[in-house]
């Protein structure tokens, strides 16, 4: 902390996390929980594929929610942010969060393929 203050970097950390950023983070946490639950189902998915399929569907639904949050945020960002450098930084951070939800959905697609192949 003293190093940050002594180098005048304190302003770097003054930006508040947007509600959209918090919402994307919350959605990512939900996806992580569902991926964990899906992994627990892998041992028995041949006997009861519906449980695993349900988690895959939840991952898909959450990713769609994340797309909506991201698109709304980006629209608002381009309308309100006047500093081009800040706009680019914030956009990239939010894009990385949104990409994380895409990857979680991809996990769900892979698991659905396992159901089709082995159930």
Question: PLM features: residue spans?
Answer:
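Single conserved hydrophobic/aromatic residue that forms the stacking wall/gate
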Residues: 2-13
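Long amphipathic all-alpha helical oligomerization modules
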Residues: 44-119
